[in-house]
Regions:
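Surface-exposed, charge/polar-rich loops and edge strands
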Residues: 1-176
Length: 176
């Protein structure tokens, strides 16, 4: 139908001082993949440094991303190499390929991934042991987003969480 030819969007200038981009962290329900096994497999794919939760948060920007496990163990992670793949420099892509698909097999339905843009909420969920693991990401740089888009690259879903947002129901326009 004609109505399906259109999509609603919000346009915000990249130079707008109010533009904020948050990361969207990944929460993992691992199915039958145990923590010890996961850590061992991740350690083969990436460089892992065990840290406290506070250190993970304070030093996160110096690393590709962080991970928290149900046991309370926390790590900072980096690629051992990007094999010439520019996408592996993007934390969400490396996490998706090496951990979510590579270890937890979420692309095969062997684990469930949920998303949360608020670090405080992620930390609370992990403290309450609601998930097996969490991938804590850095806020994406706007220039990285533009560079990858300019190369025709697609970032993993929920790589970014942009503000400002239009309130749901705030704008009504009958599309017929």
């Amino acid at each position: 139908s004609d109505a399906k030819q259109f999509g609603l969007c919000t346009m915000v200038s990249q130079d707008d001082a109010g533009l904020v981009i948050w990361p969207t962290h990944r929460l993992i329900d691992a199915g039958d993949i145990g923590e010890t096994s996961a850590i061992k497999k991740i350690g083969k794919a990436m460089t892992m440094t065990e840290v406290t939760e506070e250190e993970m948060e304070s030093r996160l920007k110096e690393h590709l991303f962080g991970m928290m496990f149900r046991s309370g163990r926390c790590f900072l992670l980096d690629n051992t190499s990007d094999d010439g793949n520019v996408m592996m420099r993007l934390d969400t892509y490396a996490a998706q390929q090496k951990i979510l698909y590579g270890v937890y097999k979420s692309d095969e339905g062997k684990s469930k991934i949920s998303y949360d843009a608020e670090l405080g909420s992620v930390k609370k969920a992990m403290a309450e042991k609601k998930h097996d693991a969490a991938i804590v990401l850095n806020a994406p740089c706007l220039q990285t987003i533009w560079d990858l888009a300019g190369q025709g690259k697609r970032m993993p879903k929920k790589t970014t969480f942009f503000f400002p947002k239009i309130w749901s129901g705030w704008v009504f326009y009958r599309m017929e």
